[in-house]
Amino acid sequence: MAQLNDNYLKLKAGYLFPEIGRRVKAFSQANPEAKIIRLGIGDVTQPLAPAVLKAFHDGVDDLANKDKFMGYGPEQGYEFLIDTLIEKAYKPLGVELKTSEIFISDGSKCDCANILDIFALDNKVAICDPVYPVYNDTNVMVGRTGEADDKGYYEGLTYLACTEENGFTPAIPKEKVDIIYLCYPNNPTGTVATKEVLKAWVDYALANDAVIFFDAAYEAFITEPGIPHSIYEIEGANRCAIEFRSFSKTAGFTGVRCALTVVPEELLAATGNGEKVSLNKLWNRRQSTKFNGVSYPVQKAAAAVYSDEGWAQIKETIDYYMENARLIREGLQEAGLTVYGGVNAPYIWLKTPNGMSSWDFFDKLLSECHVVGTPGSGFGPSGEGFYRLSAFGDRENVLTAIDRIKKNLA
């Protein structure tokens, strides 16, 4: 009989969002008249920007024209998109990148998982807690961990507590680790890292020959000046960091699928015998073998995101979501709740009232307010007692949801 990958059996029962879906489905079936408002999974609700949609259509039309038809594209992405990203997304930050250092993909979630293909299993990995579950679960899947303990911590991983007491900013680990996951603006807490904080991580990584996986999926939602949008704004990061970015939330591409990963040519890792090897070359080899590239029309649409017209339209949508975040944040505060985030990120991280558990609060909001959010404990043990709400809803639904919460909890 064929044998399976036993590591999958170590995973905690049910990925967070499917479990939310299961509970919501059960409640809906029992209460068919309830109008449920979903502020849980961070999916967007506003349509693609007109300039992006036009470029998307143009890309499809090109495929109907024999002279412009495109078949297989480069696995790394078309240069017209990569060059646009270099000029419009990175140069304004003072970051200089080469065409060979940007890889276009169909999602940051995939890249955050697939990047593990080029790293040895005996690397010591540090993950923030609470955290986007994909970081944790994919390390379990590849066999880097033992079993989970009663709290949900997996043997073999180093967890960096992000708590109310430390402002949800983890301390630099005292021991040596090889790979560090950082996400800023942070999902789920909505916090950001200053240049001083990121410099401390870069200095640690350089001193310990570690690699930082920097998830910048929400950088476009930063509203305050002086907050870094890229790890490469920090001197030396090109020698110790891989950056992941996504068009999903920035441009409403959750159903379109496009992202990018930056692997600098200066970034090296060691072989078993100590030889230094370029991670850029290894990632290129991995992508060329396992990935066929993002479709041409999608990349045409992605390039239009950074046109003057496209970015102006997208900025309006981002502002719409961040106004939702303000309304949620202030509404929850009026209800007497302690709230974090929602200023530089589209997520609000609230403290559950009266010491209630995260899942009990989920059930309370669902049954009493018909509002769905995300239990903080689903992001890790340190998320227990907290709850995440997303600002990606329609304005009317956001206002209705907050009104319901205020009436039931105030």
UniProtKB/Swiss-Prot annotation:
Top EC category: transferase
- N6-(pyridoxal phosphate)lysine modified-residue sites: K249
- This protein's source sits in the domain of life called Bacteria
* Enzymatic reactions: (2S,6S)-2,6-diaminopimelate + 2-oxoglutarate = (S)-2,3,4,5-tetrahydrodipicolinate + L-glutamate + H2O + H(+)
Q: What is the lineage of its organism?
A: Bacteria, Pseudomonadati, Thermodesulfobacteriota, Desulfuromonadia, Desulfuromonadales
Q: Which PANTHER family match?
A: AMINOTRANSFERASE
Pfam families from the UniProt entry: Aminotran_1_2
Which keywords belong to this entry?
Aminotransferase, Pyridoxal phosphate, Transferase
Q: What does this protein do?
A: Involved in the synthesis of meso-diaminopimelate (m-DAP or DL-DAP), required for both lysine and peptidoglycan biosynthesis. Catalyzes the direct conversion of tetrahydrodipicolinate to LL-diaminopimelate.
* Keyword Secreted part of the UniProt annotation: no
Residues the entry annotates as binding pyridoxal 5'-phosphate: Y72, S108, K109, Y132, N187, Y218, S246, F247, S248, R257, N292
Name this protein carries in UniProt:
LL-diaminopimelate aminotransferase
Q: Which pathway or pathways does this protein act in? A: Amino-acid biosynthesis; L-lysine biosynthesis via DAP pathway; LL-2,6-diaminopimelate from (S)-tetrahydrodipicolinate (aminotransferase route): step 1/1
Can you tell me which residues bind substrate?
Answer: Y15, G42, K109, Y132, N187, N292, R388
Q: What is its EC number?
A: 2.6.1.83
Source species, please?
Answer: Syntrophotalea carbinolica (strain DSM 2380 / NBRC 103641 / GraBd1)
Single biological process term from Gene Ontology: lysine biosynthetic process via diaminopimelate
The cofactor(s) it depends on are: pyridoxal 5'-phosphate
Q: Which HAMAP family match?
A: DapL_aminotrans_1
The record's comment on protein family reads: Belongs to the class-I pyridoxal-phosphate-dependent aminotransferase family. LL-diaminopimelate aminotransferase subfamily.
How this chain assembles, per its entry, is: Homodimer.
Question: What are the GO MF terms of this UniProt record?
Answer: L,L-diaminopimelate aminotransferase activity; pyridoxal phosphate binding
